[in-house]
Structure formats: C-alpha cells, structure tokens
Amino acid sequence: MTEYILETNALTKHYRKFSALNGLTMHIPKGSIYGFVGRNGAGKTTLIRLICGLQEPSGGEYTLCGVKNTDKKIISCRRKMGAVVESPAIYSEMTAEENLKQQSHILRTSGVENISELLELVGLGDTGKKKVKNFSLGMRQRLGIAIALAGNPQFLVLDEPINGLDPQGIIEIRELILKLNRERGITVLISSHILDELSR
C-alpha cells in the first residue's frame, strides 16, 4: 500500500474577489519528487502557504504525514517539513554560517556542528564565512535549501526554486534535489511555471 506524505482533498482557498485554489485533490507518495506545475497566479504558492500553516484553507482538507490539518498534532508534523516559500528567508548582512546558526536556534536543534556539513551538501562548502549580500541568486537559493534542511526534514517544499537562475544554476539546483532525494530519502515537492526545466 502506498504511503503518502501529503494528501489534499478538494482543497480550496478563496479571497474576496477571486479563488486561488478551487477543489485541489492530490497525493504525494513518500520518497518521491513531485512537480507541481502551473502558470503564474495558478495557486502554487497558495497551496504551499496552506500546507506550511501560513494560511487557512477556505474549504476541503489536507493531511501531512497522515495527520489532518484540523488536528492539533499538525503543528508537530510541520516540524518534519522544510520549506522555501517564494524567496529564501535569509539575512543578507549575515554570513552563510550565521544564517544557519540562527535557524538552528529558532528550531531549537543542536545542529551547530552540522552547519559545515549542510553547506557542503548544498555546494557552499567554501562560502560559510562570506556575507550573503555578496552571493549570486543561485547561491542564495542553495543557502535557502540548506536552511530548510536544518531541522532534518522528511519533506522538502520548494516554491519556484529555479526562478531567475541561469542554465548552469538550474542544473545545479536540479542535481541537488536529486541528491537529497536519493541519498537522504527526502520527499520533495517543487512548484514551477517552467515545465520543461522542471522535468529534464
């Protein structure tokens, strides 16, 4: 029997003058890489904001790791999830290491000793002492993914991770996602409006 890390059932999000999501039903198998593709404004970011608990649905429901969104246990389930929503939440005046230390402090994890390992994992091993304001867009995306990995998640959610990247940057992010899935068994949900780049 297939085990799903995320299931949505007729999930809906209405705003005053429009619907961002209208009855979305989807199932993401544990251990998969799942591409969520649609044009800009199709509701991809809205879905991600809902499952991250940043907004409440107008209708329908979802389960995360088998727990319904209406169950109080959903809060602890979200701790098994790492996300980069819209753009990475990073501090430009801090170094890469300081950004990761800050996230470890927020999550109350004892992950300080794993910071160099995380930076190495995302291809930023030699940049830990550099201020983020000097990073390229691709480096910022990779640091955002490292921060999302700080809590050792089972489920990684990436909102438009290749947006604005050059061809080499797209290749690097795609290879990183495959590596995380194969070597760490992390389930990945990727939203993108570029079907061709996502599916290669």
Per-segment meaning from a language model:
Residues K101, V112-T127:
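Conserved ABC ATPase "signature" region
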Residues I171-R184:
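Helical segment within the ABC ATPase nucleotide-binding domain
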